[in-house]
Amino acid sequence: NYSYHPLYKELHTVPWDTDVNITPYFTLHKIQGDVNKVISGERLGISVERLGISDKSPINHSSLIANPYFDLVYFDAFAPEKQPEMWSEELFRNIYACMNANGILTTYCAKGVIRRLLQAVGFTVERLPGPPGGKREILRATKTKG
């Protein structure tokens, strides 16, 4: 069981909003917050001017960060039936646009409709065994194009 590995434990105990060098080749910066604010740049402290948006209205889903930022997205929303606004094609398209090439999105929701939605926006999607004692399957979606 990999959950007892020291690196696994370290990943879960590092502070939020801080760069932490896990190994010489891996720096972790955990961001916790509303995914809409994160992908719009608001949560990252990116100004509307930096995004090149002339309109001073609030940033919405279509106002994406010009340069990808994320290598990994752990998507931990409630089930689509409980929180449907978190499972839209538009939201996943925007997350895809904010990810670096070969970036990975993972979610505990392994429903076929979500797998197809992730594929529709460009991810390559795999069903994987879930964690011990929990979900039977999870999804891993990889952005294979830059």
Question: Which residues does each PLM region occupy?
Answer:
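S-adenosyl-L-methionine
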Residues: 1-42
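Short SAM/SAH-binding signature in class I
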Residues: 28, 68-77
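A short acidic, Gly/Pro-enriched loop at the edge of an enzyme's catalytic core
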Residues: 40-44, 66-72
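Intrinsic disorder
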Residues: 44, 57, 62-63
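Conserved beta-strand signature within the Rossmann-like core of class I S-adenosyl-L-methionine
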Residues: 72, 102-109
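Short strand-turn motif at the edge of the Rossmann-like AdoMet-binding core
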Residues: 77-78, 107-111
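A short glycine-rich, Lys/Arg-flanked "PGG" loop and its adjoining helix->strand segment in the class I
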Residues: 86-101
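Class I S-adenosyl-L-methionine
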Residues: 111-146
